[in-house]
């Protein structure tokens, strides 16, 4: 498959690691680079992990600690053997003169390595994210070169990552003086209440869109219509009594689990106090 047909999907943990490496950089370092880890399947490069590679850039050369990169990759393989080298990343909003030299090294580590740039300077008020592949250029018998060509890049996440991001959003906009050091997980019933409220708001948004389309206030979108049709077909067919019975049964099970967990928590706390109780 041609490198131009690749699509890059980046997980949030990768961006967090890039920002953390940029914040911990040496005082004389203008940018940070590192290795991208993940997998490639059917033209999709999924980047799930990364690590920083110490380096120094001079006017005419680049010095990188390649032995450190190999050791970090070997350690990561022991933890997750499914992740392999898929490319490299760098902070900044564009490709520099040294990028082709660094890319040559990663071209020996994997086929069609991707280059990911993360704009940690937040130009335009947002963190720019771009992905490139290197295309060889030249004529037969003449000089050859390479050109970094942009390819599609998008953010994706697993369900646990999405849940973690929602917890992080609870502290966004809170001043550092009042920001809590920890965010405890919500109780199960509170999660159900929050999810129900969000579901209700989404349903209201869908109903408003449908009403506007019927009233010719909004131009209909065929893609949205197909998604709504798939959503309707995904709803299980059951009567109101069946749904109420199923919902009540699930609530009873949830309350039973909460009660048992609280009893276990109380028993552990009591056992801890009895263990450290001074004996006469």
From Swiss-Prot:
Q: Which Pfam families match?
A: JAB (PF01398), MitMem_reg (PF13012)
CC terms in the record's Gene Ontology section: eukaryotic 43S preinitiation complex; eukaryotic 48S preinitiation complex; eukaryotic translation initiation factor 3 complex; eukaryotic translation initiation factor 3 complex, eIF3m
Question: Subunit notes for this chain?
Answer: Component of the eukaryotic translation initiation factor 3 (eIF-3) complex. The eIF-3 complex interacts with pix.
Q: What is this protein called?
A: Eukaryotic translation initiation factor 3 subunit F-1
Q: What is its main location?
A: cytoplasm
GO MF annotations in UniProt? metal-dependent deubiquitinase activity; translation initiation factor activity; translation initiation factor binding
Per the UniProt entry, what species is this protein from, by scientific name? Answer: Drosophila melanogaster (Fruit fly)
Q: What does this protein do?
A: Component of the eukaryotic translation initiation factor 3 (eIF-3) complex, which is involved in protein synthesis of a specialized repertoire of mRNAs and, together with other initiation factors, stimulates binding of mRNA and methionyl-tRNAi to the 40S ribosome. The eIF-3 complex specifically targets and initiates translation of a subset of mRNAs involved in cell proliferation.
Record InterPro entries: eIF3f (IPR027531), EIF3F/CSN6-like_C (IPR024969), JAMM/MPN+_dom (IPR000555), MPN (IPR037518)
A GO BP term here is: antibacterial innate immune response
Q: Which SMART domains match?
A: JAB_MPN
């Amino acid at each position: 498959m041609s490198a131009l047909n690749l699509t890059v999907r980046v997980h949030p943990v990768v961006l967090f690691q890039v920002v953390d490496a940029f914040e911990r950089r040496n005082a004389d370092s203008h940018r940070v680079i590192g290795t991208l880890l993940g997998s490639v399947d059917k033209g999709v490069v999924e980047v799930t992990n990364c690590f920083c590679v110490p380096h120094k850039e001079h006017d005419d050369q680049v010095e990188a600690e390649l032995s450190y990169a190999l050791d970090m990759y070997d350690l990561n393989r022991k933890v997750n053997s499914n992740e392999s080298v898929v490319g490299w990343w760098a902070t900044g909003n564009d490709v520099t003169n040294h990028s082709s030299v660094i890319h040559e090294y990663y071209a020996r580590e994997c086929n069609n390595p991707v280059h990911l740039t993360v704009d940690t300077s937040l130009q335009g008020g947002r963190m720019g994210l771009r992905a490139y592949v290197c295309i060889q250029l030249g004529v037969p018998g003449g000089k050859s070169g390479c050109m970094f060509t942009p390819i599609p890049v998008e953010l994706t996440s697993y369900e646990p990552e999405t849940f973690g991001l929602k917890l992080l959003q609870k502290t966004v906009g809170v001043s550092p003086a009042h920001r809590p050091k920890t965010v405890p997980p919500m109780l199960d019933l509170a999660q159900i209440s929050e999810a129900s409220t969000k579901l209700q708001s989404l349903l209201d948004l869908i109903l408003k869109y449908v009403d506007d389309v019927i009233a010719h206030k909004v131009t209909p979108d065929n893609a949205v219509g197909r998604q709504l049709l798939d959503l309707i077909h995904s709803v299980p067919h059951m009567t109101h009594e069946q749904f109420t019975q199923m919902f009540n049964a699930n609530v009873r099970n949830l309350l039973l689990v909460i009660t048992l967990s609280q009893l276990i928590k109380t028993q552990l706390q009591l056992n801890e106090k009895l263990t450290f109780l001074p004996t006469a």
